[in-house]
């Protein structure tokens, strides 16, 4: 792929993906490639890679023509998701990974447009000329979408048109994965505000689930408070039902207290979520709150098992019951009567 060079800053010429897969499989871990779709980094990074000067028109622009999204992490650049060349480039990257590496899954992050600008303009994205022309052709109108009143019927159509751009790309990824290896797991990271993401970042994970394109949905329910991730998890579970697996994204990168993170994990389990995901791996092990040690001593003291791996799940359940018989119920055996009396 001529437009992309190997990133040598972190590991030189070492093939980190191959290393993760090989070593992870030695430890019995699944390795899923975490990809970012149309988000290609910050302006400084992107200028040196695929958004070079001759490809500047590939960038997605907001209603004022701005082609990046400034925030505390830099100025984010998204490719135009309607542009066929951009879509084909990304799909070709995924094909290369899926055909040449023994991956267990593909995790779609940033599967959306950029969020609106945070300045006083609140400008939303998707105003490239080809996107506008496509919208006008589909709805047989010459209206300029910049003039649409929020909440009007045509504004809703404009939002839906951009949503369908993302929906159709998810379908293309799904078709690619199933063509190469139907056993590869497809998951996605979704914004937590289910009600509004279809009209702000044009992301509608419920559509993907309903069409059978997702094996698992991961909600980015990040909060330092106890209740929000649990309540958000319940909302997603009602929306997804039994059509896909669902895991709650918990924050290990911020100021969440250790005991709160443990309680969030336990709470999500108790309301029936299939699992939790900690963002991110590095934070989980490096955080000053000692997250990793606390997790392995409590909620993750036993080895995890995937809920979709039936044989391993049944064995894990039997092992857990056997352990309880020894550690807990054994206390009530006649020979331990004295111990029981001492703790009454």
Outline where the language-model segments fall:
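Aromatic-lined carbohydrate-binding/catalytic grooves of carbohydrate-active enzymes
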Residues: 1-13
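Active-site beta-loop-alpha junctions enriched in small/polar residues
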Residues: 36-38, 110-113, 191-193, 222, ...
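Conserved, mostly hydrophobic/aromatic
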Residues: 24, 90, 97, 106-109, ...
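Glycoside hydrolase catalytic-domain groove-lining segments
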Residues: 127-256
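Substrate-binding cleft of secreted/luminal carbohydrate-active enzymes
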Residues: 213-231, 235-236, 242-343
């Amino acid at each position: 792929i001529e437009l992309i060079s190997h990133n040598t800053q972190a590991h030189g010429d070492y093939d980190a993906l191959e290393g993760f897969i090989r070593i992870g499989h030695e430890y019995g871990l699944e390795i899923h490639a975490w990809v970012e779709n149309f988000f290609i980094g910050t302006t400084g990074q992107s200028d040196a890679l695929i958004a070079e000067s001759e490809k500047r028109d590939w960038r997605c622009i907001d209603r004022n023509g701005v082609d990046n999204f400034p925030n505390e992490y830099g100025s984010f650049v998204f490719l135009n998701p309607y542009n066929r060349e951009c879509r084909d480039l990304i799909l070709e990257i995924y094909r290369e990974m899926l055909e040449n590496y023994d991956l267990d899954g593909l995790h779609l992050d940033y599967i959306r447009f950029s969020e609106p600008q945070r300045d006083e303009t609140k400008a939303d994205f998707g105003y490239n000329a080809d996107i506008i022309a496509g919208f006008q052709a589909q709805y047989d109108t010459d209206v300029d979408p910049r003039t649409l009143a929020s909440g009007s019927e045509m504004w809703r159509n404009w939002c839906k048109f951009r949503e369908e751009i993302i929906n159709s790309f998810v379908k293309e990824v799904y078709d690619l994965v199933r063509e190469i290896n139907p056993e590869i797991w497809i998951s996605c990271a979704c914004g937590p505000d289910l009600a509004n993401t279809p009209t702000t970042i044009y992301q509608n994970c419920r559509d993907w689930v309903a069409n059978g394109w997702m094996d698992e949905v991961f909600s980015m329910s990040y909060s330092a408070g106890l209740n929000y991730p649990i309540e958000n998890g319940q909302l997603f579970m009602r929306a997804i039902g039994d059509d896909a697996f669902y895991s709650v994204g918990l924050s290990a990168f911020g100021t969440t207290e250790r005991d709160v993170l443990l309680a969030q994990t336990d709470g999500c389990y108790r309301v029936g979520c299939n699992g939790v995901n900690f963002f991110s791996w590095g934070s989980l092990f490096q955080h000053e709150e000692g997250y990793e040690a606390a997790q392995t001593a409590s909620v993750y003291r036993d080895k995890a098992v995937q809920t979709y791996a039936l044989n391993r799940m049944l064995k894990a359940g039997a092992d857990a019951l056997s352990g309880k018989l020894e550690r807990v119920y054994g206390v009530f055996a006649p020979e331990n009567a004295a111990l029981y009396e001492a703790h009454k």
